[in-house]
């Protein structure tokens, strides 16, 4: 017997499932450049698409790693064998993925690169990838004993309204350094004109169309805008 569930409970259950999956993959696939997950439910099975920069490492040798992840997810969420399938998909625009850049920044700092150099490297790479704007914020005990935040930004970036949801991609990561935990926040604004889905321009964008060139008027003239039939009927002489 199929258990009936209300719409509200279904939405909450789907949200919890997605959040748990995302957190699990964030921990497990950090080194593989994990940048998001998508869940597609079909009548026969549930498809989980893992987006990462290094898909070969996610798959593993002869698909061993992806099979291990499938078994873990299947056991945790009590799916029947064969009803949940995991796929790995390469991130198309790595420079426009905030999660991928936050992970990149994290590993740069762990490898001992200076904060300024790492942040400017990320900002430059994002802007070269065709972003409209980028902002990287690093906060924590950066040099002195007192915590502070450093902000690195370039281009055009909006901070409020519905366009933030449409065009801004945000990611937050934490990195454990010798002096303490540092917080990394990356915001990337995609070019609205290149957006595949949703609005193609900002709400306040105004496009000014250049007027067409008109022929110069050499002499005054009268243009008749009446229909041709009416003009012909008026032109015909009336017989007595």
From Swiss-Prot:
Keywords (A to Z) from UniProt: Cytoplasm, Isopeptide bond, Methylation, Phosphoprotein, Ribonucleoprotein, Ribosomal protein, RNA-binding, Ubl conjugation
CDD domains, per the entry: KH-II_40S_S3
Keyword Phosphoprotein: yes
Pfam families given in the database record: KH_2 (PF07650), Ribosomal_S3_C (PF00189)
GO CC terms in record: 90S preribosome; cytoplasm; cytosol; cytosolic small ribosomal subunit; nucleus; preribosome, small subunit precursor
Acidic residues bias: start-end ranges: 230-240
PROSITE patterns (alphabetical): KH_TYPE_2, RIBOSOMAL_S3
Region (Disordered): 212-240
Effect of residue 212 to R: Abolishes ubiquitination by HEL2
Modified residues (Phosphothreonine): 44, 70, 231
Family that this chain belongs to: Belongs to the universal ribosomal protein uS3 family.
Note: Present with 146000 molecules/cell in log phase SD medium.
PANTHER family the UniProt entry points to: 30S/40S RIBOSOMAL PROTEIN S3, SMALL RIBOSOMAL SUBUNIT PROTEIN US3
UniProt protein name: Small ribosomal subunit protein uS3
Source organism per UniProt: Saccharomyces cerevisiae (strain ATCC 204508 / S288c)
Gene for this chain: RPS3
């Amino acid at each position: 017997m199929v258990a009936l569930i209300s719409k509200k409970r279904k939405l909450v259950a789907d949200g919890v499932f997605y959040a748990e999956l995302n957190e699990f993959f964030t921990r497990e696939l950090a080194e593989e450049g994990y940048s998001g997950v998508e869940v597609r439910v079909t009548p026969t099975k549930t498809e989980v698409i893992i987006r990462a920069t290094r898909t070969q490492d996610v798959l593993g040798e002869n698909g061993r790693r992806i099979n291990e992840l499938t078994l873990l997810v299947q056991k945790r969420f009590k799916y029947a064998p064969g009803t949940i399938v995991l796929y790995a998909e390469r991130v198309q625009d790595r420079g426009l993925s905030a999660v991928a850049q936050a992970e990149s920044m994290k590993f740069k700092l762990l490898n001992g690169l200076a904060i300024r150099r790492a942040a400017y490297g990320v900002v430059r790479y994002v802007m070269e990838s065709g972003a409209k704007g980028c902002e990287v914020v690093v906060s924590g005990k950066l040099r002195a004993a007192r915590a502070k935040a450093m902000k690195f930004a370039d281009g055009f970036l909006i901070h409020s309204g519905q366009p933030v949801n449409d065009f801004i991609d945000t990611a937050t990561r934490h990195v454990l350094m010798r002096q303490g935990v540092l917080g990394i926040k990356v915001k990337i604004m995609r070019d609205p004109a290149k957006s595949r889905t949703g609005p193609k321009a900002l709400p306040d964008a105004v496009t000014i169309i250049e007027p067409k060139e008109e022929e110069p008027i050499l002499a005054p003239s009268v243009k008749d805008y009446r229909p041709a039939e009416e003009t012909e009927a008026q032109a015909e002489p009336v017989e007595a």
